[in-house]
A protein has these predicted regions:
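Acidic, low-complexity mobile loops and tails
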Residues: 1-18
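Generic structural motif
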Residues: 10-14, 26-29, 43-52
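Short hydrophobic beta/alpha edge segments that flank linear recognition/processing sites
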Residues: 26-40, 57-60
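Gly-rich Lys/Arg/Thr-decorated short loops/hinges at beta-loop-alpha junctions or inter-strand turns
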Residues: 92, 135-149, 378-384
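Hydrophobic alpha-helical positions that pack around
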Residues: 114, 118, 174-288, 294-301, ...
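Cofactor-cradling patches in redox/metallo enzymes
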Residues: 149-152, 183, 372-463
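Histidine-anchored nucleotide/phosphate-binding helix
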Residues: 154-170, 359-361
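Redox- and metal-dependent alpha/beta enzyme cores, enriched for Fe-S-associated oxidoreductases
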Residues: 342-389
């Protein structure tokens, strides 16, 4: 194993501060960094020696032999489940990385439902209230091509359910709902059996469209409530927990295990085929290149390597380390060459940032002459990431397409959700605009349908009797 690089910022909030120095021996589970503000503890994922402590990372030289044992976490009261979650350094494993101990520090039984915005909830009566409080488990595996969340259900459903029950206990929620895409038949059947005797836990089936895993989309699909871009799920008496995060919670409480590993999918232009290579319990800090080699190595010339998903991931390098939030490593085919043609960018809250889309346009040899935003993309404060008013449920984009045409664009690159891409296609091609989606090079690599015209119904019924 090559050197492990553990970044000091793997979560929402401020970077952690190292509490080790060069030359220190560490074990799997040794605490090596602590928060300086909002954040989560960071632990060594291997047995070894600290080589360097840099401004943004701790570099560890692993021992040749690695033991399975780890240093257990310790808290003053071993029965304090929330304290165990906090000490274990668990964050949202689905990508955002919000510290889970902070998220679960709420008493949902005493939480009042916030006033709903009538404009985005026109179908609900003004006096609508939720009778129950909820843990909503995000099992959507939102980014196309990734499969590690579904694999965890298939192989570790008991652990996941234990984690969900702990979440319910900690937050005093009286119900839990698994939000999972209807297409995952095997996982759904396994999950159904795992909760057969859990009267307060149910399953809600989602359509196979992006972004069903966005936090507010999970609330909307499961509870029928549209939250504003400023509201948290607590406004709907709920907490949304990623599936893998729930499993980490079970590990922290049952095994006193710190958060030192990550499940992820490696996929794309890989020797042996483009199928998903799922790796469970990978030590945090292992390099992208090492995981690609474990999957078979890169097959010839490629376009780029993405860390994360096709929509929200970023281009990365072989020596970059994985973190607690890394869900995917995608090796893509080469980009098409637009030969300097004029390009318009349609930036969406559900896809890449303007910076990421400009990077893609540059790699396609296109000249960006126009930039528009999806009409539902809201900037809550200057410089903050965009938020969609109704994730996955978008109106037309005719006005933006007309602007692109006015600005003499030949091509447009879009980063929109399934529904929004569909509305772009309703008018863009008729205006002579040639459309690329920012995920096209990934979708073509993994054999997934391109995001253009929506062919999947957005409505999916719940399983009979909530199960």
């Amino acid at each position: 194993m090559e050197n492990v690089q553990i970044l000091l910022r793997q979560h929402v909030g401020a970077p952690c501060a190292a509490i080790v120095k060069a030359g220190d021996e560490v074990k799997k589970g040794t605490k090596i960094a602590t928060p300086t503000g909002l954040g989560a503890n960071i632990f060594s994922s291997v047995y070894g020696v600290v080589e360097e402590v840099l401004e943004d990372r701790i570099v560890i030289r692993p021992d040749e032999e690695q033991k399975d044992e780890f240093v257990p976490i310790e808290v003053e009261d071993e029965n304090d489940k929330l304290a165990l979650v906090k000490e274990a350094g668990i964050v949202g494993m689905g990508g955002a990385g919000f510290p889970t101990g902070i998220k679960l520090g709420i008493n949902l039984a005493e939480t009042e439902m916030a006033e709903l915005d009538a404009e985005i909830n026109p179908e609900l009566p003004a006096d609508f209230k939720l009778e129950h409080s909820y843990i909503l488990i995000n099992a959507a595996e939102c980014e196309p091509g990734l499969e590690h969340n579904i694999r965890q259900i298939e192989e570790q459903s008991d652990k996941v359910v234990r984690g969900v029950k702990y979440c319910m206990e900690i937050t005093h929620a009286d119900k839990a709902i698994f939000a999972i895409k209807k297409k995952n038949n095997k996982a759904i059947e396994i999950l159904r059996k795992a909760i057969a005797n859990e009267a307060e836990i149910s399953i809600h089936l989602l359509p196979d469209i992006y972004p069903m895993g966005e936090e507010r989309a999970v609330v909307r699909e499961c509870l029928g409530v549209n939250l504003t871009t400023m509201q948290l799920p607590s406004a709907a008496r709920s907490v949304v927990v990623n599936l893998e995060t729930a499993a980490k919670i079970a590990e922290a409480i049952d095994e006193k295990k710190p958060c030192i590993t990550k499940n992820l999918t490696v996929r794309g232009k890989i020797n042996g085929g483009n199928q998903a290579h799922v790796f469970m319990d990978v030590p945090v800090g292992v390099s992208v290149g090492e995981l690609i080699e474990r999957a078979g190595g890169i097959d010839g010339v490629y376009g780029e390597i993405i860390m994360g998903g096709a929509f929200t991931g970023k281009a990365t390098e072989l020596d970059a380390p994985i973190t607690k939030t890394t869900g995917g490593i995608l090796v893509t085919i080469e980009f098409p060459d637009l030969h300097g043609a004029n390009v318009g960018l349609l930036v969406c809250a559900c896809g890449g940032s303007e910076e990421r889309m400009r990077e893609i346009a540059q790699k396609m040899n296109g000249k960006v002459v126009s930039v528009c935003r999806c009409k539902q993309a809201i900037e809550n404060k200057p410089g903050a990431p965009l938020k969609c008013l109704r994730p996955g449920n978008c109106p037309g984009q005719v006005k933006n397409n007309m602007q692109f045409k006015k600005d003499k664009c030949e091509y447009i690159i879009i980063g929109n959700c399934s529904d929004c891409s569909n509305t772009v296609m309703a008018s863009g091609p008729k205006m002579g605009l040639k459309v690329f989606h920012q995920t096209d090079h990934v979708m073509r690599t993994v054999g997934h349908g391109l995001y253009r015209t929506l062919r999947v119904s957005k409505q999916v019924d719940q399983l009979p009797n909530g199960k």
